[in-house]
From Swiss-Prot:
Entry function: In muscle, parvalbumin is thought to be involved in relaxation after contraction. It binds two calcium ions.
Family the entry assigns: Belongs to the parvalbumin family.
Residue pairs linked by disulfide bridges in the UniProt entry: none
Boundaries of every EF-hand domain copy: 34-69, 73-95
Gene Ontology CC: cytoplasm
Family matches, as Pfam families: EF-hand_7 (PF13499)
GO molecular function: calcium ion binding
Gene: PVALB
Annotated protein name in UniProt: Parvalbumin alpha
Modification Phosphoserine, positions: S19
Sorted UniProt keywords: Calcium, Metal-binding, Muscle protein, Phosphoprotein, Repeat
SUPFAM superfamilies: EF-hand
Domain notes: AB domain, comprising of helices A and B, is involved in structural stabilization, protecting the hydrophobic core of the protein. It is required for high-affinity binding of Ca(2+) and for Mg(2+)-binding.
Amino-acid positions noted as binding Ca(2+) 2 in the UniProt annotation, renumbered to this chain: D86, D88, D90, K92
């Protein structure tokens, strides 16, 4: 679904603390070029508890969904991404 080399580069680009930019990351892994169904498939992989949503606790570990040896997001990075993705303010990101 996503190119392994693109994922490796994207994870490497945000290896430093506080360097994660969700827009840049998703562009680098190729999600911006995927259709809605393909994006939904990736979302389902990242939705670890299969609730249909990505909650803040899952979001903290989102990079590990792409690469097992990736770092966790900081609280600041997690909150920034949640604010960008949580369109209705319920503390979750839907597909």
């Amino acid at each position: 679904l996503l190119n392994a080399e693109d994922i490796k580069k994207a994870v490497g680009a945000c290896a430093a603390a506080e360097s994660f930019d969700h827009k840049k990351f998703f562009q680098m892994v190729g999600l911006k070029k995927k259709n809605r169904e393909e994006v939904k498939m990736v979302f389902q992989i990242l939705d670890k508890d299969k609730s249909g949503f990505i909650e803040e606790e899952e979001l903290k570990f989102i990079l590990k969904g792409f690469s097992a040896d990736a770092r966790d997001l900081s609280d600041t990075e997690t909150k920034r991404m949640m604010a960008a993705g949580d369109k209705d303010g319920d503390g979750k990101i839907g597909a």
